[in-house]
C-alpha cells in the first residue's frame, strides 16, 4: 500500500516545494549580492 501511495505524495512535494526553495534561495542570493 505504501509503495502505491508514496509516489502520489512525493511528486507534489518535489513539484511544489523544490521550486519554492529554489525561488527563495535565488531571491536571497539576489538580495545578498545586490544584483538588482
UniProtKB/Swiss-Prot annotation:
<keyword id="KW-0934">Plastid</keyword>
<dbReference type="InterPro" id="IPR036357">
    <property type="entry name" value="PSI_PsaI_sf"/>
</dbReference>
<keyword id="KW-0602">Photosynthesis</keyword>
<comment type="function">
    <text>May help in the organization of the PsaL subunit.</text>
</comment>
<keyword id="KW-0150">Chloroplast</keyword>
<keyword id="KW-0472">Membrane</keyword>
<dbReference type="GO" id="GO:0009535">
    <property type="term" value="C:chloroplast thylakoid membrane"/>
</dbReference>
<protein>
    <recommendedName>
        <fullName>Photosystem I reaction center subunit VIII</fullName>
    </recommendedName>
</protein>
<dbReference type="Pfam" id="PF00796">
    <property type="entry name" value="PSI_8"/>
</dbReference>
<keyword id="KW-1133">Transmembrane helix</keyword>
<comment type="similarity">
    <text>Belongs to the PsaI family.</text>
</comment>
<keyword id="KW-0812">Transmembrane</keyword>
<dbReference type="GO" id="GO:0009522">
    <property type="term" value="C:photosystem I"/>
</dbReference>
<dbReference type="InterPro" id="IPR001302">
    <property type="entry name" value="PSI_PsaI"/>
</dbReference>
<feature type="transmembrane region" description="Helical">
    <location>
        <begin position="10"/>
        <end position="30"/>
    </location>
</feature>
<keyword id="KW-0793">Thylakoid</keyword>
<dbReference type="GO" id="GO:0015979">
    <property type="term" value="P:photosynthesis"/>
</dbReference>
<keyword id="KW-0603">Photosystem I</keyword>
